[in-house]
Regions:
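Short, glycine-/small-residue-rich phosphate/pyrophosphate-handling segment
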Residues: 134-135, 139-165
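Phosphate- and divalent-cation-binding pockets in alpha/beta enzyme and binding domains
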Residues: 18, 59-62, 148, 182, ...
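Activation segment
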Residues: 109, 149-150, 193
Length: 197
């Protein structure tokens, strides 16, 4: 019997309003930040990667031209994170579980991602990384949670669903801080850039 079919949903539709420019296109050793993120997910052996685009969709597609991904466009990206999450879940709902990833987290360790996937046990599971007692990203969601994820609205992420289902959560402790670092500010972007040097 084969294992569960797990896909990744990479959220890459946002406006980067706190950054002044599209952070996903920031250069890291000749590669856009989004390509670094997707590359680490692919290296973990994820079956299929869905990239949700919105703002500057064509430029994001160009940045990932050599990546083996499926693009999902979110016309409502300006309404907030939840619309992108819904678009990704709807496109990938035939899978048993979804690894929901932020596009601006290029330091997530591929070995840690493999451990998250290995920790998945059934359709009600939620697998979350923990570093220094802080919950990180990405989060692996079993199929039983897809309907709830599809009901999110506004700029609300899925953290509230995680809190409401704590008995189904498997925490995977990691030593790498990449699960906590996303490029939400110019300072955070610089910290990530220094970490990749």
């Amino acid at each position: 019997m084969s294992g569960p079919r797990i896909a990744a949903v990479v959220l890459a539709a946002g406006l980067s309003s706190r950054m002044g420019s599209n952070k996903l296109l920031a250069d890291f050793h000749g590669q856009p930040l989004i390509a670094q993120t997707v590359g680490r997910i692919a290296a973990a052996g994820v079956e299929q990667i869905f990239v949700v685009t919105g703002h500057q969709a064509e430029v994001i597609k160009q940045a990932l031209a050599s990546a083996k991904v499926r693009f999902v466009h979110n016309d409502a990206y300006a309404s907030g994170l939840a619309s992108s999450l819904r678009a990704g879940v709807a496109a990938a709902k035939d899978h048993d579980a979804l690894l929901v990833c932020l596009g601006d987290m290029p330091l997530v360790n591929s070995a840690d991602l493999k451990r998250f996937i290995a920790a998945y046990c059934d359709d009600r599971s939620i697998v979350v990384p923990v570093k220094d007692r802080q919950l990180g990203n990405p989060v692996l969601w079993g199929k039983a949670h897809f309907k709830t994820l599809l009901s999110l609205t506004g700029d609300r992420g899925a953290r509230s669903i995680l809190e409401e289902n704590r008995e189904r959560v498997t925490e995977v402790t990691v030593t790498d801080s990449g699960v906590l670092l996303d490029a939400d500010t110019p300072e955070a972007l610089e910290q990530i850039r220094e970490s990749l040097s």
